[in-house]
Swiss-Prot record:
GO terms for molecular function: ATP binding; ATP hydrolysis activity; ATP-dependent protein folding chaperone; unfolded protein binding. This is Chaperone protein HtpG. Residues 1-347 are annotated as: A. Belongs to the heat shock protein 90 family.
Length: 639
C-alpha cells in the first residue's frame, strides 16, 4: 500500500456539497439513482472498450451493479464490475467539476431552496449526491486491464479535503461505501434500497442486484404434500435489465419513460414530452427523444456539451453525439441506436458519414413534428415550451434551410392584435387575419416590448387596423435576416424606408401624400441644409399621426437593431446615416416651418432629429449635448 496523499476539493465542489446537503434534503433518495446510474454507465463503457480489447473483461463478461446494506455498521455499498478508474482519474473525477460555466451556475442560485433544487438537478450532481446521506464516503476502484496493486482508495468526509492511496483490489470496477449520517440510517435497509431501485432504476440495461438470503429445507406439512428443498443465498436482479428503448412502446409506462429521461439527463424534473420510434427498412434504428420541461442553466454556453447518446446495436458508444441534432435543437435529450453504423465509430467518422446525415435528417424532422403536434393539440403546453426554448428555435431558419418553413410555423411573437407581451401569435395566425389587399407581414424590432409597442412607426398602421408583429429579443434581427417570407408573404419592417402598403393605400391617400411633398419642398430643403451629413435624406411622411418626426433605415442599409447586434458580437460596424422623416401635420413641425431665425431653426431641427434617434435606438452618442439643447429650447419658450 502506498503512502496516503491529501488533496483539497476544487472551490466549486465545496460549494456544491454545501448546497446539496441544504437544498436536496426533501429528495434524499436520489443519491441511489445517481450512483446506480453512474455504475451502469461504467459497465456500458467497459462493454464498448472490450469490443476491441476483449482482455479487459478479465474472464468476467457478466456486467452488473450490486447494492448492499449493513445495518450494524450503518453503510450502503454500490459496487460495479465496469471500467474502473486509475489514480489520476480518481483525483480528476472525484475532486473537481469538469464543466464549463460552473461559476455562472453558482451565480444563478437564488437562495430559494425549491428553485435551487431544480437548478442543482439540471447541473447534474452525480457522484457528489452521496454526501446528501453520508458523512463519509469511501471509494475503492481498479481500472480494467490494470494490476491488482494499482487499485486506488479515495476517502472524504465532504468537508474540503479528500485522501487518495494505492491499495490491492483483485476485482476490477468501483465500490462506493457510504457511511450514513445518524439521521439517515433508514437507508441501511434492504427493503428501503430495493424499493428505491425498483422506483428509479428499472430501465437500466445492466442487472442491478441485491443479495437474496437462502431458505432452509421444509418438510412436507401434510400427507401427499411435497417437501421444499433448501435454497442458497444468491444475488438477484431487482430490475428488468433490458434496454428500455428496445421494448415495444405499448409495454413501457409513462413513469418508466420519465425515469429513463432522468437517468440519461440527470434532470430532476419530468420531461415535457417524448417520442419513441423504431424504423426498419433501408435504415434500421431506434430513437427515443425528449423535450425537457425546463431550459438547462447553461443553454447559452458555447462550450456546453450537447447531443444524443449513441448506441450501435444496443452497445453504448458515446455521449453527446452532437452530429445527430442541429444546434438550434441542442436542448433535445435522448438516444439513437443504429444497426447500420460500425461499432468502432468515432466522432471523426460521424462527421462525414451518409448514415449520420440520414439519421440527423430523420430525427430533426421527428422533433419538429413533435413540436408541430404539441402546438396544434395543446397550445398551452406549447407556450411552456416556447417560454423555455423559443429563442433557441429562432436560430433555426439561419441554420436549417431545408426545414425553414416548418420552423417558421413554430415561431411565436407578440403582436398589436393582442396588446400583450406574451409571445402567442404564430405567422399562420397573422396571415389568417391579414386585411383584404394586404400582401406583406409587417413587423418591428426594438430593444424592449414597450419600445416596440409604443414606437411612432406603428401610428399609421394602428389607425388603419393593420396588425404588426412586435419583436424585442436580441436574436430577432438575426432571425428576420434569414426569414424573408412566410406562406408567400414577404416580411417587411415598419422602420425601413417606404411602408409599401400597396392596395391598403387608396388613391386619395396617395394624392394627399404627393400634395404634402410638394407643399413641404421648402421645409425639407432647409432641414437638409442645416443637418448636413448627419442624415442621408430628409422627407415628409404619412406614417406618423401623433409624432413630429422619426428616423428610418435607408434601402439596403442595416437597421439600428442589426448594428447593435453586430457591435455586441465585437464587430466593428460603421453606423449608416438615417433617413429623417417629418410629419408636416404636427404642430412642432409647423412651428419649425414658420421659424425665420436660421439659428433657432437649426436648433429645432437638431432637437427633432435627436428625439427621433432616441426613440429609435434607445440611446444617443452624446446625451449631455441633447439635454443642453433641450434645456436651451425650453428656457427660450418660457421667456
Amino acid at each position: 500500500m502506498s503512502h496516503q496523499e491529501t488533496h483539497g476539493f476544487q472551490t466549486e465542489v465545496k460549494q456544491l456539497l454545501n448546497l446539496m446537503i441544504h437544498s436536496l434534503y426533501s429528495n434524499k433518495e436520489i443519491f441511489l439513482r445517481e450512483l446506480v446510474s453512474n455504475a451502469a454507465d461504467a459497465a456500458d463503457k467497459l462493454r464498448y472498450e472490450a469490443l476491441t480489447k476483449d482482455e479487459l473483461y478479465e474472464g468476467d463478461g457478466e456486467l452488473r451493479v450490486r447494492v448492499s446494506a449493513d445495518s450494524e455498521k450503518g453503510t450502503v455499498t454500490i459496487e460495479d464490475n465496469g471500467i474502473g478508474m486509475t489514480r489520476d482519474g480518481v483525483i480528476e473525477h472525484l475532486g473537481t467539476i469538469a464543466k464549463s460555466g460552473t461559476a455562472e451556475f453558482f451565480k444563478n442560485l437564488s437562495g430559494d431552496e425549491s428553485k435551487d433544487s431544480q437548478l442543482i438537478g439540471q447541473f447534474g450532481v452525480g457522484f457528489y449526491s452521496a454526501f446528501i446521506v453520508a458523512d463519509k464516503v469511501t471509494v475503492r476502484t481498479r481500472a480494467a486491464g490494470h494490476a491488482a496493486d494499482e487499485a486506488v482508495q479515495w476517502e472524504s468526509a465532504g468537508e474540503g479535503e479528500f485522501t487518495v492511496e494505492n491499495i490491492v483490489k483483485e476485482s476490477r470496477g468501483t465500490e462506493i461505501i457510504l457511511h450514513l449520517r445518524e439521521e439517515e440510517k433508514e437507508f441501511a435497509s434492504d427493503y428501503r434500497l430495493r424499493s428505491i431501485i425498483t422506483k428509479y432504476s428499472d430501465h437500466i440495461s445492466v442487472p442491478v442486484e441485491m443479495w437474496q438470503e437462502g431458505t432452509p429445507a421444509q418438510e412436507a406439512t401434510e400427507e401427499g404434500g411435497e417437501a421444499i428443498p433448501a435454497t442458497e443465498g444468491h444475488w438477484k436482479a431487482m430490475n428488468k435489465a433490458t434496454a428500455l428503448w428496445t421494448r415495444n412502446k405499448s409495454d413501457v409506462t409513462d413513469e418508466e419513460y420519465q425515469e429513463f429521461y432522468k437517468h440519461i439527463s440527470h434532470d430532476f424534473a419530468d420531461p415535457l414530452l417524448w417520442s419513441h420510434n423504431r424504423v426498419e427498412g433501408k435504415q434500421e434504428y431506434t430513437s427515443l427523444l425528449y423535450i425537457p420541461s425546463k431550459a438547462p442553466w447553461d443553454l447559452w454556453n458555447r462550450d456546453r456539451k450537447h447531443g444524443l447518446k449513441l448506441f450501435v446495436q444496443r452497445v453504448f458508444v458515446m455521449d453527446d453525439a452532437e452530429q445527430f441534432m442541429p444546434s438550434y435543437l441542442r436542448f433535445v435529450q435522448g438516444l439513437i441506436d443504429s444497426n447500420d453504423l460500425p461499432l468502432n465509430v468515432s466522432r471523426e467518422i460521424l462527421q462525414d458519414n451518409k448514415i449520420t446525415t440520414a439519421l440527423r435528417t430523420a430525427v430533426t424532422k421527428r422533433v419538429l413534428g413533435m413540436l408541430e403536434k404539441l402546438a396544434k393539440n395543446d397550445p398551452e403546453k406549447y407556450q411552456t415550451f416556447w417560454a423555455e426554448f423559443g429563442q433557441v428555435l429562432k436560430e433555426g431558419p439561419a441554420e436549417d434551410f431545408a426545414n425553414k418553413e416548418k420552423i417558421a410555423g413554430l415561431l411565436r411573437f407578440a403582436s398589436t392584435h393582442t396588446n400583450e407581451a406574451a409571445h402567442t401569435v404564430s405567422l399562420s395566425d397573422y396571415v389568417e387575419r391579414m386585411k383584404e389587399g394586404q400582401s406583406k407581414i409587417y413587423y418591428i424590432v426594438a430593444d424592449s416590448h414597450e419600445a416596440a409597442a409604443n414606437s411612432p412607426h406603428l401610428e399609421l398602421l394602428r389607425k388603419k387596423g393593420i396588425e404588426v408583429l412586435l419583436m424585442s429579443e436580441r436574436i430577432d434581427e438575426w432571425l428576420i435576416n434569414h426569414l424573408s417570407e412566410f406562406d408567400g408573404k414577404q416580411l417587411h419592417s415598419v422602420t425601413r424606408g417606404d411602408l409599401e402598403l400597396g392596395e391598403l393605400e387608396d388613391a386619395a391617400e396617395k394624392e394627399a401624400q404627393e400634395k404634402l411633398e410638394t407643399e413641404s419642398e421648402g421645409l425639407v430643403k432647409r432641414v437638409k441644409e442645416v443637418l448636413g451629413d448627419k442624415v442621408a435624406e430628409v422627407k415628409v411622411t404619412s406614417r406618423l399621426t401623433d409624432t413630429p418626426a422619426c428616423v428610418v433605415a435607408g434601402a439596403g442599409e442595416m437597421s439600428s437593431q442589426m448594428i447593435k447586434l453586430m457591435q455586441a458580437a465585437g464587430q466593428a460596424v460603421t453606423e449608416s446615416k438615417p433617413v429623417f422623416e417629418l410629419n408636416p401635420e404636427h404642430p412642432l413641425v409647423k412651428r419649425l416651418d414658420t421659424e425665420q431665425d436660421e439659428e433657432v431653426f437649426g436648433q429645432w431641427a437638431e432637437l427633432l432629429l435627436q428625439q427621433a434617434q432616441l426613440s429609435e435606438k434607445g440611446s444617443l452618442a452624446d446625451p449631455s449635448a441633447f439635454i443642453k439643447l433641450m434645456n436651451k429650447m425650453l428656457l427660450a419658450s418660457v421667456k
